[in-house]
Amino acid sequence: MNKSRWQSRRRHGRRSHQQNPWFRLRDSEDRSDSRAAQPAHDSGHGDDESPSTSSGTAGTSSVPELPGFYFDPEKKRYFRLLPGHNNCNPLTKESIRQKEMESKRLRLLQEEDRRKKIARMGFNASSMLRKSQLGFLNVTNYCHLAHELRLSCMERKKVQIRSMDPSALASDRFNLILADTNSDRLFTVNDVKVGGSKYGIINLQSLKTPTLKVFMHENLYFTNRKVNSVCWASLNHLDSHILLCLMGLAETPGCATLLPASLFVNSHPGIDRPGMLCSFRIPGAWSCAWSLNIQANNCFSTGLSRRVLLTNVVTGHRQSFGTNSDVLAQQFALMAPLLFNGCRSGEIFAIDLRCGNQGKGWKATRLFHDSAVTSVRILQDEQYLMASDMAGKIKLWDLRTTKCVRQYEGHVNEYAYLPLHVHEEEGILVAVGQDCYTRIWSLHDARLLRTIPSPYPASKADIPSVAFSSRLGGSRGAPGLLMAVGQDLYCYSYS
């Protein structure tokens, strides 16, 4: 009797020992320590991991998750996550993830500074030349591969910016940059400390190696509200104005403003003449696009909440097209009389500019994403369209069959407005993710060619803005990528 009672008590004690969270924690620590102490030949599977995987992620994936605790892969033990209360609690999953991402970013920056990037094994200039001589590569493929090789060897260099107000350069942060058609000017929007935005134009014609120096022309009168969307506009001549969609502030409604580039001193010497600022009362504009199509000459479009507004700058005539969702992205086709729109609902549709806004005949094409569309780009032959959304999907659509023919993997986006940069001459696609990494894909086979970490720590306020061109600084310029982040401008030029 006493023996059975003793065995029952022993079983009960062992069961309560296992159910107590403190003992579970200690057992997990012991198991973790024992795993860490195993010899190297027992962990051979871990050596096969991809080099892009962070050490923190690899460490936490092999240990069980305990509610209310997190595992530190460096110290190899669990720590308690305190519930929300008045005291400051630095131990959160977000802070842990941020720390892992920062350590990965610093590691990639060190790798970039230490050696040149190689796109893939056996991919070098000598092998490409030999294949071309043997007839295995035609001229087109050889040019594409040569561009890819030079792209993989781009090195980061800081650009020295000069201005009439040097003190502002140290405090104002870049919000976005936008190169003009010839890539000899860069329109900039900078966030100022007191609130609002300041605009400037950087002359890129002086952007030459080895000394990368540029001058920023500013017009301090135009310190204004938050910019929702911006594009170059060709009213008097090519890229004579900048079209801005501004948010409303207090009792001041939102508007679309045509800002003459001539108002920035010496922005385009010899061509620009003093111009007038034109402002159109268009509240709540999410996106804008300028038309170079002869069917909509001197016109621009704005994407609003549940409608598209087409405005003629010269006559002031307007056409309104009703939609079922907010229009977040727009672009005019050049040859076909079409305006493509991307919506918050995930729908992409085209407006036939020859039709009026009466009836439903103006919807020419309809495509669908699973999330809000943030960017649409029409390829030069106007038979394909590139679109990205807030789920991080980038798809290439065939407009003739309305089917997705290619998808570009790796982009990161959850809720931000992030543009796409398509460069068919170089055969590449460039996009900056919400994780602050700039990714470059091959346009032809969707292969990820390069991932560039941000020079600044990743944050929502410091997502880089980029501009890629085959001729940075004008017709005699070299191909390269400009990246604006924080107060700095960087150039990734072909070596």
From Swiss-Prot:
Residues 1-17 have a biased composition (Basic residues). The keyword Repeat applies. Signal peptide: none annotated. Keywords: Repeat, Ubl conjugation pathway, WD repeat. Pfam families: Beta-prop_DCAF4. Pathway: Protein modification; protein ubiquitination. WD repeats lie at residues 368-407, 410-451. Residues 24-34 have a biased composition (Basic and acidic residues). Residues 51-62 have a biased composition (Low complexity). One of its GO terms (biological process) is protein ubiquitination. SMART domains: WD40. GO terms for cellular component: Cul4-RING E3 ubiquitin ligase complex; nucleoplasm. Residues 1-66 are annotated as: Disordered. May function as a substrate receptor for CUL4-DDB1 E3 ubiquitin-protein ligase complex. Interacts with DDB1 and CUL4A. This is DDB1- and CUL4-associated factor 4. It comes from Homo sapiens (Human).
